[in-house]
């Protein structure tokens, strides 16, 4: 029995939080059990499939990694395939080949509909590669959707059939070029642009945002990313912000009617970030490099961010990613995922966002001409496109609803 009013209050809060999570998480396990009995499948093999490079499209320097030149290309990389005894297969982003045999040991001979039962062993035996866990679970959900004959987002509980996309810049560039880009994107139907705040001084960052706001008016939303949470520790390349710069920047961006300020401090400066969130009205966003439901529980309970941004390739696989989504709903917080890598991770984000009423945007890395989002989507036979109204429509085919171009597969 609780002895104090505080204990009663805490027990009531924990009960309500648990009850909220139970209501918010779609009843996938029971649905999976029903489909498992109706659709017996057995995993027979897992393969890593390499993709041909079609062509290079240019070189860029990412704002968060100054001095490092990235060659952008169409094609290349790899995907993972999970095959079954019924001829169905699922696809996911490429996984680390070093973990392939461990993955086979846990999945071959199993029914993909037992995903909740398989999630624990995957984390135990492949825990050193969260990217690989995510790749495998994405492929499993693609397989489950194909077996059920439904798009993944409908299995997760569809809230919407299209999602507004925002164009996320990669380079710092110049104010003049970012103005040109913003005006062009607005004319193409994009509803929002995310700029990078990486100039040596606060004044230069603000002047860039001011120039873009003046050019596009109030008819286009602007987000700003400081990318201050890229490393585990207290060092990263480029300019380092202190709390004062974060606070002053947030106030300036608030006056410019920006939607949010992203990652203005180090990844684990939770106390400072919570304090910053309490001092400004503009939402502080972040979390793309945080991993695990436990970290997000702390972030949400301590009101670290106004908007949480998990990435399915980092957070904790599809299983953990969706649990984080339910947790954000229980705390009445918006969840707007990080970009997901640009191809199959991004497509999986699209399905998840379509199942969450508290998720109003999808991030699309799009910095043409060298790095348009179409580069990542070019590996698909039926690539989604941002429509003239600025939306990505949900694929309606079963599973993820996309297939890999056969001409790109390395034999």
Set out the residue ranges of the language-model regions.
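N-terminal secretory signal peptides
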Residues: 1-11
